[in-house]
Amino acid sequence: MCIRDRFWAVAYLSKEKITVKKEEQGEIKEGLKLILRNKNLLCTMLYAFFNMFGMLGRISVAVYFYMHCVQNFTYITIFMMMQMIVGTIIMPVTPKIIEKIGNRKTAILSMLIQGISLIVLFVGPYENIAFDFVILAIYGLGYIAGPCGSCMMIDAIDDFDDKYGVRNDGMAFSIQGTATKVATAIANSLFLVVMGAFGYAGGVEMTPHIKEGINLAANLLPGIVFFIGIIPLLIYDLDKPGYMDGVRERLAERDKKKREHQSE
């Protein structure tokens, strides 16, 4: 058997196969109702939606900003990767920050950092390369909230399970993934439409008005979206000290009693 055949054999045989009994399967309609009843879960999804809307929407048009507004082709690749580079550097300290101030406050801090830095880039001397490096490095600090969305979603699911005895992890994460893709698609289209509304088209001469539209789409609009994403975080209320510890203790105790009852 060749290496390729072994690879596919391992891939096929090592897949986890879970068979869900018909009586244990929930209805999609009921699952959606449960999600709509879970305020904190909805807030987490909206936060992730706006975060992806601003971040990935900007990525789709940022290259035009560096080409036509900054007008420096030498550093385009670095500028495009700056957020990821800074995010990789600060990732080791992220858990300590989250542990100290909590997921919600870390997410709010991240949105503020990203929103403020992009608006400063919008109004500032963006043709100055040193200025761009500093602002984009600050913008990259927004990566401190990387795991916060998933953590808050799990907390919301656990809290709902504790209160109502029902959890729908699968549907919640499926909707979250879909919402992220929808946000990316809408943002990409919307920001390009804004550029087109200011007269941008391939091969046209760059006028100050067109550059203004590119700057608006690449910096101001994503910055505003990040600020809007703070609103659902202000409504989210599962970050009270010790609250989730109590929730998990009750869930663990309930599951323990359930297992003991089943073993009898």
Question: Predicted regions span which residues?
Answer:
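C-terminal ends and interior cores of transmembrane alpha-helices
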Residues: 113-127, 132
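Cytoplasmic membrane-interface "Motif A"-like loop-to-helix N-cap segments
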Residues: 99-111, 163-167
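Intracellular loop-helix junctions on the cytosolic face of multi-pass helical membrane proteins
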Residues: 4-63, 67-73, 214-217, 222-264
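Hydrophobic core of transmembrane alpha-helices in multi-pass small-molecule transporters
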Residues: 129-147, 152
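A late C-terminal transmembrane helix in Major Facilitator Superfamily
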Residues: 166-198
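Helix-to-loop junctions at the C-terminal end of transmembrane segments
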Residues: 89-103
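Juxtamembrane helix-start elements in MFS-like secondary transporters
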Residues: 72-80
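A membrane-interface helix-boundary motif in multi-pass transporters
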Residues: 4, 193-224
